[in-house]
Curated annotation (Swiss-Prot):
Binds the 23S rRNA. It holds the Pfam family Ribosomal_L31. InterPro entries: Ribosomal_bL28/bL31-like_sf, Ribosomal_bL31, Ribosomal_bL31_A, Ribosomal_bL31_sf. This is Large ribosomal subunit protein bL31. The keyword Ribonucleoprotein applies. Part of the 50S ribosomal subunit. Residues 65-85 are annotated as: Disordered. Residues 73-85 have a biased composition (Basic and acidic residues). One of its GO terms (molecular function) is rRNA binding. GO terms for biological process: translation. GO terms for cellular component: ribonucleoprotein complex; ribosome.
């Protein structure tokens, strides 16, 4: 049995509130828990998540390190520099 007067009050039906609406109940040491985001309105869990990657990662890598189409243009430029010298 727990010692009296040292443990916080336990609320077995504490309300979890998001945007003024009770979304669930749980056990807690506070009677009400106010949250900004929960699984019912988070974009990841609702399926409304938008992917902002407009450029493919592989294409970006190829362009950055000169592989693929951008690399061939760079090689032509180097060959032209040698002809000018």
């Amino acid at each position: 049995m727990p010692k009296p007067e040292i443990h916080p009050t336990w609320y077995p039906d504490a309300k979890v509130i998001c945007n003024g609406e009770v979304v669930m109940t749980t056990g807690s040491t506070q009677p009400e828990i106010h949250v900004d985001v929960w699984s019912g309105n988070h974009p990841f869990f609702t399926g409304t998540q938008k992917i902002l990657d407009t450029e493919g990662r592989v294409d970006r890598f190829m362009r950055k390190y000169g592989m693929g189409g951008a690399g061939k243009a760079g090689e032509d430029k180097k060959a032209g520099d040698k002809a000018d010298a």
